[in-house]
Amino acid sequence: MSAAAVDAANAAPLSGSKEMSLEEPKKMTREDWRKKKELEEQRKLGNAPAEVDEEGKDINPHIPQYISSVPWYIDPSKRPTLKHQRPQPEKQKQYSSSGEWYKRGVKENSITTKYRKGACENCGAMTHKKKDCFERPRRVGAKFTGTNIAPDEHVQPQLMFDYDGKRDRWNGYNPEEHMKIVEEYAKVDLAKRTLKAQKLQEELASGKLVEQANSPKHQWGEEEPNSQTEKDHNSEDEDEDKYADDIDMPGQNFDSKRRITVRNLRIREDIAKYLRNLDPNSAYYDPKTRAMRENPYANAGKNPDEVSYAGDNFVRYTGDTISMAQTQLFAWEAYDKGSEVHLQADPTKLELLYKSFKVKKEDFKEQQKESILEKYGGQEHLDAPPAELLLAQTEDYVEYSRHGTVIKGQERAVACSKYEEDVKINNHTHIWGSYWKEGRWGYKCCHSFFKYSYCTGEAGKEIANSEECIINDATGEESVKKPQTLMEIHQEKLKEEKKKKKKKKRKHRKSSSESDDEEKKHEKLKKALNAEEARLLHVKEIMQIDERKRPYNSIYETREPTEEEMEAYRMKRQRPDDPMASFLGQ
């Protein structure tokens, strides 16, 4: 194909005509394809300069080929470019600038005296036609008379703003309009000053100010300090009353006598939820819903009943939550037994069915109770007085003094215990259980831990304290040391250096000793597991005994558990939420 034919093809419009003859892309040889790929790799590695489009911009070599390649029907020259991927200017919307706005109060142009071609035939204005004219239809239009031609109206521009332009509240605002308000306030202030000056002139002419200056109170400084300010306020009260109606706004209380504005704001002395516990590992605060479900004082050891805020989880158990859960449980049970009820689909039907079920259940219990009483008797035991009367505990009002004596009402009788009280045996002055130490009960008078022992008095206390001192001295001898001399310090340093050398020699022997340590740990863990099993059996036996017949001793120990005991406790602990918990006993 000749060069003239190619130029003619490029100059022809891309309208799909049959006369258009474009050169089709030729098939590349293997050598050309290999060179092209090598050049692309070099450009990606930065060893070769990137391609440049017709605008002089670099083309990123990492852009895929299906994006960077130009279709042959768009650009037959196959020049490297990304113009076809950018927004086309003819498709972009043209928005108005931020300074453009509708013109207000535009003066009308001078009235013309001659009809202009293309103007309204009725009034003669150039801005509209006869069918859009708002004037009264004339008997003979301005086109034929040439008189009373109306001026041209101002045509407002068609503004089209972008996202920010539509939300610009100050667009089109003229700051000079605010000067009118400033001038009005300045006039009011000037009028008040002139009135005040006139009053002072009148008082000076009448002699009131001279009498006030010559008064003894004014000379000795005994005049009330607020008298002058009160006069100033009283002189301005008349002016303030004029504007009191304008100043009265919702959410405010305006007092013209005191000239103050009091805000009706709610006192916020409560603490924000997220400031109650600054520990990041404490209860989570959701800023979107402003909710803190858990108790922020959970890790602080405080009782939830004593704190002012214990989390938002209490809302889950308020209102109709419990009743709704009971209704849902009844719906599930009824569905399992063949009743077609659903809480969300048929709420009214389910509510009526649940109410009738509760009534029938109560009737069935009453019938069952009556049948048992008729068959076996025992109605007289059910007619016994309540437990409050039996234990002499009532809700009668009783008023006490500061010293504990009864002022009004009858003193309440003390509830008697089922156990014997104030029983002192074997010459003891205190009862058994008045002393507690290291998991054992005893007598407070002699610190004895044997229930049926004789009281030894202060001598027993001294013996117990001396035993503690001996134990404490044995443990504290190591901590209390005499001051050392320089020679002793030097000898200790030499010993430490020898120990370090020995440790270096024994490093290669540690591998053999590690196996021995593992065996020892295994044996300790085995013993701890056996002890934990024995403890669980002991606890199980105690729980099977009646609560009133259980012994007084406690399982509590004061010493800290070892690592093996803690590991055994974790291994033997049963978790109710564990799905495999039922298989542990097998």
From Swiss-Prot:
The keyword Nucleotidyltransferase does not apply. Residues 235-248 have a biased composition (Acidic residues). It is found in: Nucleus; Nucleus speckle; Cytoplasm. Residues 20-44, 529-550, 557-578 have a biased composition (Basic and acidic residues). There is a cross-link at residues 349, 408 (Glycyl lysine isopeptide (Lys-Gly) (interchain with G-Cter in SUMO2)). One of its GO terms (cellular component) is spliceosomal complex. Signal peptide: none annotated. The modification Phosphoserine is found at residues 215, 227, 235. Keywords: Acetylation, Cytoplasm, Isopeptide bond, Metal-binding, mRNA processing, mRNA splicing, Nucleus, Phosphoprotein, Spliceosome, Ubl conjugation, Zinc, Zinc-finger. Residues 498-510 have a biased composition (Basic residues). A motif (Bipartite nuclear localization signal) lies at residues 129-169. A zinc finger (CCHC-type) spans 118-135. Residues 1-12 have a biased composition (Low complexity). One of its GO terms (molecular function) is pre-mRNA 3'-splice site binding. Residues 1-103, 206-254, 491-586 are annotated as: Disordered. The keyword Transferase does not apply. The modification N-acetylserine is found at residue 2. Pfam families: Slu7. GO terms for biological process: cellular response to heat; intracellular protein transport; mRNA splicing, via spliceosome; RNA splicing. The CCHC-type zinc finger is required to retain the protein within the nucleus and prevent its shuttle back to the cytoplasm via the CRM1 pathway. Belongs to the SLU7 family. Required for pre-mRNA splicing as component of the spliceosome. Participates in the second catalytic step of pre-mRNA splicing, when the free hydroxyl group of exon I attacks the 3'-splice site to generate spliced mRNA and the excised lariat intron. Required for holding exon 1 properly in the spliceosome and for correct AG identification when more than one possible AG exists in 3'-splicing site region. May be involved in the activation of proximal AG. Probably also involved in alternative splicing regulation. PANTHER family: PRE-MRNA-SPLICING FACTOR SLU7, STEP II SPLICING FACTOR SLU7. Component of pre-catalytic, catalytic and post-catalytic spliceosomes. Associates with the spliceosome prior to recognition of the 3'-splice site for step II, probably during catalysis of step I. This is Pre-mRNA-splicing factor SLU7. It comes from Bos taurus.
